Amino acid sequence: MFLLMVPLFSYLAAASLRVLSPNPASCDSPELGYQCNSETTHTWGQYSPFFSVPSEISPSVPEGCRLTFAQVLSRHGARFPTPGKAAAISAVLTKIKTSATWYAPDFEFIKDYNYVLGVDHLTAFGEQEMVNSGIKFYQRYASLIRDYTDPESLPFIRASGQERVIASAENFTTGFYSALLADKNPPPSSLPLPRQEMVIISESPTANNTMHHGLCRAFEDSTTGDAAQATFIAANFPPITARLNAQGFKGVTLSDTDVLSLMDLCPFDTVAYPPSSSLTTSSSPSGGSKLSPFCSLFTAQDFTVYDYLQSLGKFYGYGPGNSLAATQGVGYVNELLARLTVSPVVDNTTTNSTLDGNEDTFPLSRNRTVFADFSHDNDMMGILTALRIFEGVDAEKMMDNTTIPREYGETGDDPANLKEREGLFKVGWVVPFAARVYFEKMICDGDGSGEMVQSEEEQDKELVRILVNDRVVKLNGCEADELGRCKLDKFVESMEFARRGGDWDKCFA
């Protein structure tokens, strides 16, 4: 089965919501994402919780402009480890507990630590991330919700078919509609709201799904990301491993991969719990989650090493460092172009023509202007690569697989360092847990009135803009203006690689 359509929310009221209102004292807010202990939590690569990335170009809608279209492509929220990673974590903990004859004071907690994390599913932390994401999406794009009693005015939702992705879409929708209801305060006579459905697209190995890779055999068999990481681990992890073996235990000798598993526990053990819970401590006066004790075993420089390792894996496995990565994102880009231009999807790669040719499962109407899609980090990397977002990354200088470039460890999240980001790739800026990419169309005029597009002829005035985790990215190949935007027709032309199907023929050569 390629498709399921499930009901979302036909009626939402505060009494029907689960956990789901943001705590003003929490580390995680709809506006800025996760901000506590940022020197550590923002250096976990793709395992970082979402945080708003400072932007050199203002993410606000420019004065004199009015939005005409908004689409979000979102990663699922924070999850438990995958089965393979969970097994590796459990193995190293067992190794330590069964062999260690002495623990240094900072390591003694391991003796009594019971590994009880789940596998693969969304955590409570991840649920709240997605609720916050839905709230923020409504607050940013409320102007496009012309009439909340009209189904076509509300977001059209699609999710790739894994449980955590579906749950993320549901929690996002809860946040969106709770914000809408709080804003509009509709009279009882207007309730229930129009019934909404979510399109769920199968992730089976033979399913065409633009939000889940799996069909391109040559890409699936590639090992470029693993190879880059293996080289980097061999060059950079031995000093960390030697320190832990010398100072942390007696009677046990950890390998570099054992140490990597212990480092993985820092983010996974932290995001296993809600942002505000019994873990709140006096050391965090503003409230929020205490870092896992496993984080204290490592230095800030250790986490720079860890963060760079994750960036290498994504860049060379699922991004520009893999020659077939962009091709995995071509189908989604062609769907995006169809929505932006209100025209049929033209694609022969990963799109499902049955779904994309049906108005119920892929609506193409000038009245439909708000969309939300939910996917995974690896798939988003391919899509962003196909969108030419990473063309400014200097791979030779910034993505060396043995040495961390100076700029990588010095830029951080400080807005004062924005200029130093040019040519730099950090995966935590791109696809953290609950990552979101906003695609916007807007029309602008000289007098600031921001009149709506009135006719097809006026479409040539529409501009396209892309924001990645609140950071405006300057578009490539389409004569972008100083605000990073391109005219719609120029943007479409710049997607020539996607429009011709990428290198799909090489998938089966």
UniProtKB/Swiss-Prot annotation:
CDD domains in alphabetical order: HP_HAP_like
EC number(s) per entry: 3.1.3.-, 3.1.3.8
Glycosylated position list: 171, 208, 348, 352, 367, 401
Keyword Secreted listed: yes
Gene Ontology MF terms: 3-phytase activity; acid phosphatase activity
Xref: SUPFAM superfamilies: Phosphoglycerate mutase-like
Pfam families: His_Phos_2
Keyword hit for Nucleus: no
Biotechnology: Phytic acid is the major storage form of phosphorus in plant seeds and, thus, in seed-based animal feed. Phytases are therefore of considerable economic interest.
Residues forming the catalytic site: 76 (nucleophile)
SS bond list: 27-36, 65-444, 216-507, 266-295, 478-486
Protein origin, superkingdom: Eukaryota
Catalytic activity: 1D-myo-inositol hexakisphosphate + H2O = 1D-myo-inositol 1,2,4,5,6-pentakisphosphate + phosphate; 1D-myo-inositol 1,2,4,5,6-pentakisphosphate + H2O = 1D-myo-inositol 1,2,5,6-tetrakisphosphate + phosphate; 1D-myo-inositol 1,2,5,6-tetrakisphosphate + H2O = 1D-myo-inositol 1,2,6-trisphosphate + phosphate; 1D-myo-inositol 1,2,6-trisphosphate + H2O = 1D-myo-inositol 1,2-bisphosphate + phosphate
Keyword vocabulary terms for this entry: Disulfide bond, Glycoprotein, Hydrolase, Secreted, Signal
PROSITE patterns: HIS_ACID_PHOSPHAT_1, HIS_ACID_PHOSPHAT_2
Family, per entry: Belongs to the histidine acid phosphatase family.
Quaternary context: Monomer.
Function: Catalyzes the phosphate monoester hydrolysis of phytic acid (myo-inositol hexakisphosphate), which results in the stepwise formation of myo-inositol pentakis-, tetrakis-, tris-, bis-, and monophosphates, as well as the liberation of inorganic phosphate. Myo-inositol 2-monophosphate is the end product. Is also able to dephosphorylate the classic acid phosphatase substrate p-nitrophenyl phosphate.
Protein name per the record: Phytase A
